[in-house]
């Protein structure tokens, strides 16, 4: 066939995008197209009889062929399903076949309207060949699908404007049909690119992902392709790719003595190679095309993490029946055509899912992963803690952040080293902290389905902890939770499922335990204080901070709220031990009062009525009234518990003994309200001597001591029930009702006040004893309070700072130390060291600087500047003597002073100025007073001005530091003499401490630790260390 050199045919609308390309490339591509189509036509002409003969003789062999080796292999899934729906009856096939052949010839005529006569004759020959092929009965199904898809594809091409000049449908089809002459490959081992070819045109249904100028071009022959898949096929067939980048890069020297542009190009290439790296073998590539060919050639895409579409979650979370349905509906990998062709009915069900997968991905990666991911994403994007499915990764991330499930999953996995999905400790911890109290509050309503479900799941959880079968029961519970949904594939499409932890209904009925920030803070602080008190080892120097993210070993998280919060030290007095079994058997009814303040925190004060309704299920009049009264009268209501304790001590003691005896039996039985309430009061009426072991109460007591508010040690009655006090503390702090210490002793409370409020609702037709005990419990919850919320976090931060293992004041110790000594104890642990003055206590990095300290530092810095002969001032460093003087006088550590100096120097070098000093880079500084904003030109005048603010001269600072030192040492000797009596207690705490610092009486495990302490804290040089260290045993 003669070659056309310069004459280009007029393009149809579908080719409008190509006009942006250069003229030479168009001509070159068209020449290649002519050569290819000519050679193909000649091949076809020579092979026509053979092809027909083969079709008639080898029909059985081709009937069993996979679609991937047939001319229909470029069909997308949707095309294939349409085809399978249309090709049911043979008469229907024959009717549509004639129509389609006419349509196809019309299309050909309309697409190439101005072709020369040679091309027309060539196309006529090919039309005759195809008519002959398609008339054969064995080809009816495939022929129909082929002709339909070609016409549809032409429609889509003209609509999207995304076809290319060097692609011709009949040439492509011919090359596919010529493949039938090759020896047939086995269906079980498909060709390397079968899945790629199967999806070849699917992206054109919904438009290409890469539109506009970002066409995929082969870098060696400049052939342009619409999709990366087509370019990858081309590169694999022609070998136009590089697979040895890593070896080349090692040999190539990296020299940048090139022109600037070349050097930047090489840098870009290196950056690309850092990104375009095979995740399996680590080879890096210059281009995305090379990487994709490498992945498909080596099958490394199968070994990349997350390749498997259905994780192990599905086998554990889905019931067998649902799993069978899911397996039937889930299409197999695109290589095998049975998944979508065998059954035409799943097509409408999964249509939206598959369409979205086309829109988002377009099968650009050439593998089956994306498609299977879309089909199975309800199983993949599933919270490993609670099993909820999500549509997108973003939704799953939001869910885990809001509910805090990421913390529980990761912490439990790192702790236990188990499979993440079903870690029972994390599951139980989450359930006991959120689900258990909430669902318990709904338990008395058997009429509502949600309440019964929750009750079932809660009892299941309790049974789980006792029978040691967490895996099976957890699976049952997951099944129970997922019973409501018809099919796992439908889950992400259900709008109510996406935000199941944020809906108002769930917050109201409390069945899901929503994501509450205060609750998570409370859990964190609780665990932190537990770990600090127990002295459990941790992996860094800050046990109380990091311990918040560990699961305590002694905790049984699946028990109700009280037992989770309650952490009892084994070395406590014997009389304290019965508290644990009591709270293990605290029945379902007593929890709603503890829940009331908690839900109040969640929903803010406007929802008081809802909360009262919610927790009033068991005895509506009584509980609602008690809660509303406790809300309205929260000021005076902090007193009554003591009176209730005095009113009925004897029966409660008897109840105590009964509880000890029958604790184990009652675990499995729900207890009546009356006994449960008296159980609740049994804690309140416990002997006044032992301390409260509730961690948050301990936190409150140490907070009060730390802030100087407390004069008395914390006694047990002030915070009776762990569950109620835990919630009430944060409830009260959020409302900011009162800022007075909770430690006022029981004896000072007037009896009249408490009686007035105890019998306030005696007009109600209920038992007064029950009312009294209920009242005591609810007001008990109110009595355990904290300062307003704005101070709470900073106080907790300060509290955590002073909780290292060796220096934590334990509750057991504090109960035996008189109040004055306890206060001294806390001050000793926190502040009293030789360099700290009583006026200026160190607060740590978060606090603002003491202005006097800043003035001293600025004056010393200004005095260190020296003047050159030219009159310019230059920076110099403060010597160790000056730093020591500042440290001794201000109480700042040497490290803090060095950091301040380094920061000032850095700012001066970088910007030429800092807050109190400008124009330093020009050599003529201007000094600013931070107190009165005056300006000075010379250091001497600036220093004298600062001295006027300070009230003393800098040269007197040494003398004042010595006087201050003697004062502090006197105070230390006084404190240490006062501490002689509880020395035995300190010995109990610091069993492994062997050495002691003479200056501040702190004990250390090794001599090295004492020397470090002397250097850092007291600024003592190493030669003097020996005289300040003593052995604890010698004393």
From Swiss-Prot:
Bias (Low complexity) ranges: 432-450, 968-977
ZnF start-end (C2H2-type): 216-240, 276-300, 381-405, 927-949, 995-1018
Gene3D superfamilies referenced in this protein's UniProt entry, alphabetically: Classic Zinc Finger
Biased composition annotated in UniProt, kind: Acidic residues: 21-37
Localization annotation: Nucleus
Sequence ranges of Polar residues compositional bias: 39-49, 66-92
GO terms under cellular component: nucleus
Domain of life assignment: Eukaryota
Signal sequence range: none
Primary localization: nucleus
PTM description: Sumoylated.
Any GO BP annotation: regulation of transcription by RNA polymerase II
DNA-binding region: 842-912
Keyword list, A-Z: Coiled coil, Developmental protein, DNA-binding, Homeobox, Isopeptide bond, Metal-binding, Nucleus, Phosphoprotein, Repeat, Repressor, Transcription, Transcription regulation, Ubl conjugation, Zinc, Zinc-finger
Residue span of region Disordered: 1-92, 240-266, 432-496, 600-674, 764-791, 968-987, 1015-1035
Biased composition (Basic and acidic residues): 460-483, 601-669
Cross-link (Glycyl lysine isopeptide (Lys-Gly) (interchain with G-Cter in SUMO2)): 189, 307, 316, 418, 462, 481, 498, 602, 801, 821
Coiled-coil blocks: 13-42
UniProt GO molecular function: DNA binding; DNA-binding transcription factor activity, RNA polymerase II-specific; zinc ion binding
Residue(s) carrying Phosphoserine: 981
InterPro entries: HD, Teashirt_fam, Znf_C2H2_type
Subunit structure: Interacts (via homeobox domain) with APBB1 (via PID domain 1).
Annotated family: Belongs to the teashirt C2H2-type zinc-finger protein family.
Function: Probable transcriptional regulator involved in developmental processes. May act as a transcriptional repressor (Potential).
Official protein name in the record: Teashirt homolog 2
Species name: Sus scrofa
């Amino acid at each position: 066939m003669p070659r056309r050199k310069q004459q280009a045919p007029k393009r149809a609308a579908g080719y409008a995008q190509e006009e942006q390309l250069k003229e030479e490339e168009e001509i070159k591509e068209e020449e290649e197209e002519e050569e290819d189509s000519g050679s193909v036509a000649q091949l076809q002409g020579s092979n026509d009889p053979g092809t027909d003969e083969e079709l008639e003789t080898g029909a059985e062999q081709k009937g069993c062929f996979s679609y991937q080796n047939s001319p229909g292999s470029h069909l997308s899934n949707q095309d294939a399903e349409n085809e399978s729906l249309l090709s049911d009856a043979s008469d229907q096939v024959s009717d549509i076949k004639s129509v389609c052949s006419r349509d196809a010839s019309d299309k050909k005529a309309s697409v190439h309207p101005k072709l020369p006569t040679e091309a027309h004759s060539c196309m006529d020959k090919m039309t005759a060949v195809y008519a002959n092929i398609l008339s054969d009965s064995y080809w009816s199904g495939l022929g129909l699908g082929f002709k339909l898809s070609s016409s549809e594809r032409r429609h889509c091409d003209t609509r999207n404007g995304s076809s290319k000049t060097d692609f011709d449908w009949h040439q492509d089809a011919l090359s596919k049909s010529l493949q039938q002459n090759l020896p047939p490959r086995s269906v079980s081992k498909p060709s390397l690119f079968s899945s790629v070819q199967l999806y070849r045109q699917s992206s054109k249904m919904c438009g290409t992902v890469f539109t506009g100028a970002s066409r995929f071009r082969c870098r060696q022959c400049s052939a342009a392709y619409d999709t990366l898949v087509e370019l990858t096929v081309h590169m694999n067939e022609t070998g136009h790719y590089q697979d040895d980048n890593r070896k080349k890069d090692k040999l190539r020297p990296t020299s940048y003595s090139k022109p600037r542009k070349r050097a930047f190009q090489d840098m870009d290439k290196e950056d690309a190679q850092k990104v375009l790296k095979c995740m399996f073998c680590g080879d890096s590539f210059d281009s995305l095309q090379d990487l994709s060919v490498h992945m498909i050639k080596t099958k490394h895409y199968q070994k990349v993490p997350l390749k498997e579409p259905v994780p192990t979650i599905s086998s554990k979370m889905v019931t067998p029946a649902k799993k069978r349905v899911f397996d039937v509906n889930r299409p197999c990998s695109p290589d095998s055509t049975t998944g979508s062709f065998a059954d035409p009915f799943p097509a409408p069900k999964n249509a939206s899912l598959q369409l979205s997968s086309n829109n988002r991905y377009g099968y650009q990666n050439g593998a089956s992963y994306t498609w299977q991911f879309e089909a199975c994403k309800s199983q993949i994007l599933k919270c490993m803690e609670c099993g909820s499915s999500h549509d997108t990764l973003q939704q799953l991330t939001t869910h885990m952040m809001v509910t805090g499930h990421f913390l529980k999953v990761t912490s439990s996995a790192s702790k236990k080293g188990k499979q993440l999905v079903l870690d029972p400790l994390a599951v139980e911890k989450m359930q006991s902290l959120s689900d258990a109290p909430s669902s318990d509050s709904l338990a008395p309503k058997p009429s509502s389905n949600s309440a019964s479900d929750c009750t079932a799941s809660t009892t299941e959880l309790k049974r789980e902890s006792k029978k040691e079968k967490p895996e099976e029961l957890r699976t049952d519970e997951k099944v129970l939770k997922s019973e409501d949904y018809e099919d796992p594939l439908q889950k992400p499409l259900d709008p109510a499922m996406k935000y199941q932890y944020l809906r108002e209904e769930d917050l109201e009925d409390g069945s899901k335990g929503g994501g509450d920030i205060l609750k998570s803070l409370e859990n964190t602080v609780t665990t932190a204080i537990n770990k600090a008190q127990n002295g459990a080892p941790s992996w860094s120097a800050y046990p109380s901070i990091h311990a918040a993210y560990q699961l305590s070993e002694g905790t049984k998280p699946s028990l109700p709220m009280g037992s989770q919060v309650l952490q009892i030290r084994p070395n406590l007095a014997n009389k304290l031990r019965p508290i644990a079994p009591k709270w293990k058997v605290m029945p379902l009814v007593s929890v709603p009062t503890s829940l009331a303040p908690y839900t109040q925190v969640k929903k803010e004060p406007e929802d008081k009525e809802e909360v009262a309704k919610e927790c009033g299920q068991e005895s509506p009049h009584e509980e609602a009234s008690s809660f509303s009264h406790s809300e309205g009268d929260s000021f005076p209501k902090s007193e009554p518990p003591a009176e209730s304790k005095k009113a009925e001590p004897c029966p409660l003691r008897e109840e105590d003994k009964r509880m000890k005896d029958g604790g184990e039996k009652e675990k499995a039985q729900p207890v009546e309200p009356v006994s449960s309430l008296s159980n609740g009061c049994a804690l309140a009426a416990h002997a006044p001597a032992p301390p409260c072991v509730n961690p948050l109460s301990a936190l409150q007591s140490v907070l009060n001591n730390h802030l100087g508010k407390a004069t008395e040690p914390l006694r047990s009655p002030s915070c009776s029930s762990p569950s109620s006090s835990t919630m009430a503390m944060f409830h009260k702090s959020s409302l900011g009702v009162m800022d007075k210490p909770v430690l006022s002793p029981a004896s000072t409370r007037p009896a009249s006040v408490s009686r007035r409020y105890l019998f306030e609702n005696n007009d109600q037709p209920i038992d007064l004893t029950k009312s009294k005990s209920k009242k005591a419990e609810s007001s008990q919850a109110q009595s355990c309070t904290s300062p307003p919320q704005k101070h709470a976090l900073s106080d907790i931060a300060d509290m955590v700072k002073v909780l290292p293992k060796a220096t934590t004041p334990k509750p057991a110790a504090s109960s035996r130390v008189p109040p004055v000594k306890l206060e001294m104890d806390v001050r000793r642990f926190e502040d009293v060291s030789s360099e700290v003055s009583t006026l200026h206590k160190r607060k740590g990095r978060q606090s603002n600087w003491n202005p006097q300290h800043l003035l001293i530092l600025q004056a010393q810095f200004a005095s260190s500047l020296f003047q050159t002969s030219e009159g310019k001032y230059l920076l110099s460093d403060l010597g160790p003597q000056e730093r020591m003087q500042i440290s001794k006088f201000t109480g700042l550590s040497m490290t803090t002073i060095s950091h301040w100096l380094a920061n000032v120097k850095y700012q001066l070098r970088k910007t030429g100025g800092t807050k109190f000093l400008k124009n330093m880079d020009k050599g003529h500084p201007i000094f600013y007073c931070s107190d009165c904003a005056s300006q000075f030109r010379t250091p001497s005048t600036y220093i004298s001005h600062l001295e006027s603010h300070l009230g003393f001269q800098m040269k007197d600072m040494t003398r004042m530091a010595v006087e201050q030192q003697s004062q502090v040492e006197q105070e230390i000797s006084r404190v240490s003499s006062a501490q002689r009596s509880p020395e035995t207690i300190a010995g109990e705490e610091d069993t492994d401490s062997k050495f002691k610092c003479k200056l501040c009486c702190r004990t250390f495990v090794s001599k090295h630790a004492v020397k470090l302490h002397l250097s850092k804290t007291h600024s003592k040089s190493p030669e003097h260390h020996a005289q300040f260290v003593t052995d604890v045993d010698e004393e």
